[in-house]
Regions:
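C-terminal peripheral helix-coil segments that are non-catalytic and often amphipathic
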Residues: 1-3, 172-187, 196-263
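Basic, amphipathic alpha-helix used for nucleic-acid engagement in HTH/winged-helix/SANT-Myb modules
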Residues: 1-18
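Short, amphipathic alpha-helix enriched in basic
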Residues: 17-46, 50-54, 67, 74-77
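Solvent-exposed, amphipathic alpha-helical segments
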Residues: 26-34, 105, 201-212
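Residues in the helix-turn-helix
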Residues: 58
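Residues in the recognition helix of alpha-helical DNA-binding motifs
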Residues: 62-63, 72
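Hydrophobic alpha-helical connector segments
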Residues: 83-137, 199
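Amphipathic alpha-helical packing segments from all-alpha helical-bundle domains
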Residues: 113-130, 134-186
Length: 263
């Protein structure tokens, strides 16, 4: 923006709330296409000023430093973005479809457990594919990586507060989803385990394997062959099999000879 542009903007007197909204909108549009990177070095205020078509002087009256702008922007991104809505809706939809087409197996605890394993197999695969292609997920992980690497100050505290809020929200939503599934299957966890622990563990497994799969895809894309819903061998991704193993270890076992449940 040159001096004549700045003079023209002064004459229009854009209100501060509009300047703020335009700047954040311009930045969000860029980030929605390209994502965040660790360190936030790719967030150029001058470029956003140009895209937003607002006076530079007005921008720096709102945010005296780039760090203040970044902190404000981070909060805005992760309040409004789709990714902040919780667990992967595609995975949950796929798992629901497995449940709905498996009514013949739901009459016994053993059958319900088999359906649960199939839901994990299909749902975990869906989550992996979604995360691999998700700009939002990459941005979220960049946010987490920066929470301890930024210099001390208000900007770092604001970023950490956003990361903590998001991590808590996502974990609690996944916890609630797991509790709903346990209730649906008339299942319970062994004493000492909680659905919040389960939410943390499954998220860590999925995130970790997807991250490492970007470097070691030939190894981490390997599949495990094991019985599926009907007892026939099917392919399990490492993510799905690991999550199944975690869930199996945390669930109360079922009796093989339990009579059919009333329906």
């Amino acid at each position: 923006m040159n001096d004549s542009d700045e003079t023209a903007f002064r004459s229009t007197r854009i209100p501060a709330d509009q300047v703020r909204a335009r700047m954040l909108r311009a930045a969000r549009e860029v980030i929605s296409a390209h994502g965040l990177t660790v360190g936030f070095a790719h967030l150029p205020m001058e470029e956003y000023i140009r895209l937003a078509a607002v006076p530079r002087s007005s921008v720096y009256r709102i945010w005296s430093t780039r760090e203040e702008f970044v902190a404000d922007l981070i909060g805005e991104i992760f309040v409004a973005d789709r990714f902040a809505d919780g667990a992967d809706p595609d995975a949950q939809r796929a798992m629901t479809e497995v449940y709905e087409r498996s009514s013949a197996h739901l009459g016994t605890a053993v059958g319900r457990r088999q359906v649960a394993w199939e839901m994990i197999r299909i749902g975990a695969n869906s989550s992996v594919e979604t995360l691999r292609a998700s700009v939002d997920w990459s941005s979220y992980n960049a946010l987490l990586a920066c929470t301890f690497s930024m210099e001390e100050g208000p900007a770092r505290e604001a970023v950490r507060a956003t990361a903590r809020r998001l991590e808590t929200m996502l974990s609690q939503r996944l916890r609630d989803y797991y509790q709903d599934v346990l209730d649906q299957f008339s299942a319970s966890l062994r004493p000492g385990f909680t659905t919040l622990q389960l939410a943390h563990l499954t998220a860590i497994v999925t995130d970790g394997l997807v991250h490492r799969g970007r470097l070691l895809d030939d190894e981490l894309d390997a599949v495990v062959t094991a019985p599926g819903l009907d007892g026939e061998p099917v392919e399990w991704s490492l993510t799905a099999w690991t999550i199944r193993s975690i869930v199996d270890g945390m669930l109360e076992p079922v009796a093989e000879d339990e009579p059919p449940a009333d329906r």
